[in-house]
């Protein structure tokens, strides 16, 4: 320790070092987390303009779909790593817990998990970097929840292969990780980041005339609007609607944590009024 520890730094350290934490993951790898204090501040985001804004729809087959038609396909390179992980887990299950061979197998399993995590992080970082490089001043996304996208089948439970397969694809897509990393990058670059409420029917609403097609099925990747006869790509149409609703509801002209739809706000006010009336009746 007197001679120091050799480290590989991901980037140059700027600012005054406050704390330094050394950690070790289950795979036996050591990391150093350095907390620094700097005088620099984040740039102020510009005013929101429709011509410099983009909407992003997250998906399973395509990780991100932009309102300008650009699609970032989800990678299937996890499959080979996951098959290798399953092989190592079978070996670990045959070892006696606490023994030397069990410990060796456990480390191999941990390294396989770490490899899959690194592959997923690399994919997300590349997608975020490509989006930021396009020079958008405003980015609108849907505040999705993984639980809302999961298929629930109480009748068949865990034995529904179709449900498990789709839920696995949703987890692999890492929609939450993409949104978090994109928001962090927007903050550091001075880009407006707008989240719209998750229950807005972005896929079922025609961006040309505003007609909502309630009969749209999940398997339909393209559809024709019954009102204006416009031919729509499901994902691109959703991204355009996300952009439009994000810009129209953002009256402040700055980045907002989450933009609620007009109907959502009206329902919230109605619920508040009904609760006030019930309180008055109780007092009487």
PLM feature spans:
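"…together with the soluble PPM/PP2C metallo-phosphatase catalytic core" -> "…together
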Residues: 1-5, 15, 29
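Short aromatic-glycine motifs in intrinsically disordered, low-complexity regions
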Residues: 4-7, 46
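Short amphipathic beta-strand and strand-loop transition segments with alternating hydrophobic
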Residues: 18-24
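Positively charged, helix-rich recognition surfaces that bind polyanionic ligands
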Residues: 11-13, 26-284
